[in-house]
Amino acid sequence: MATLTDVRNALQNAWTDDMKKAVKNAYRNAEKRASQGGNYAKCLEQASMQGTPYSLAAKKCAIENNLASTLSGLWGTS
């Protein structure tokens, strides 16, 4: 699963502005999907079991789940 650290690293390692823009767009799209989709509910449940402030933890988890597929699509990896 991609993490927010992976996004930061991808931005630091991107060698063109186009790649940086693609990573930023992937993050924004993942963030939008996180607030709309089923990942959010699943992550809310997971966060509440961990006893963390669940709205932030769930949003972060859902964004990371969505980023995993988006970033792998950008680089053609799984």
UniProtKB/Swiss-Prot annotation:
<keyword id="KW-0238">DNA-binding</keyword>
<comment type="function">
    <text>Completely wraps the viral circular dsDNA genome to form a nucleoprotein filament. These interactions between the viral genome and the nucleocapsid proteins probably maintain the DNA in A-form. This certainly protects the viral DNA under conditions such as the extreme desiccation of its host.</text>
</comment>
<dbReference type="GO" id="GO:0019013">
    <property type="term" value="C:viral nucleocapsid"/>
</dbReference>
<keyword id="KW-0543">Viral nucleoprotein</keyword>
<comment type="subunit">
    <text>Homodimer.</text>
</comment>
<keyword id="KW-0946">Virion</keyword>
<dbReference type="GO" id="GO:0003677">
    <property type="term" value="F:DNA binding"/>
</dbReference>
<protein>
    <recommendedName>
        <fullName>Nucleocapsid VP1</fullName>
    </recommendedName>
</protein>
